[in-house]
Regions:
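Accessory DNA-binding and partner-docking regions appended to nucleic-acid-acting proteins
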Residues: 1-128
Length: 128
């Protein structure tokens, strides 16, 4: 018998991102989800700047994202779809994921504040 896994806020943000993409008719790989959550703007992600989770996890890395996505697939919140042409896995939210998403969103306060990436000055010219 499979144990239940209770999602955390980061899992909620990942599920919300994938749900948003699925509603628009898109599916994303782990790299695509990471690009949206960390706020990378390029030709693939510029149309998703209005996504509620765009740029909310700026310090997340690829290893953590893959781990979280695999865990969500294991517990049935996401479905993994293999694309033979691109030789990559893409993710789609399941019915269980949709129910959990609506329940978690209505019972928990989640901050979807966008984080600005302002690089700090690390080298300055020495004054006279």
């Amino acid at each position: 018998m499979q144990k239940n896994y209770f999602i955390n806020v980061t899992d909620y943000k990942v599920l919300l991102t994938i749900s948003y993409l699925n509603e628009l008719g898109y599916i994303a790989s782990a790299q695509g989800v990471l690009k949206i959550l960390s706020g990378v703007i390029d030709e693939e992600t510029e149309m998703f700047e209005l996504c509620p989770t765009f740029q909310v996890l700026v310090s997340y890395n690829s290893k953590k994202m893959t781990r979280d996505l695999n865990r969500l697939v294991t517990y049935g919140y996401l479905k993994r779809i293999h694309n033979e042409e691109l030789k990559d896995y893409f993710f789609e939210i399941t019915e269980k994921g949709k129910v959990t998403l609506s329940y978690f969103g209505s019972h928990h306060k989640v901050n979807l504040k966008k984080h600005d990436i302002n690089p700090r000055v690390t080298i300055i010219k020495k004054g006279k």
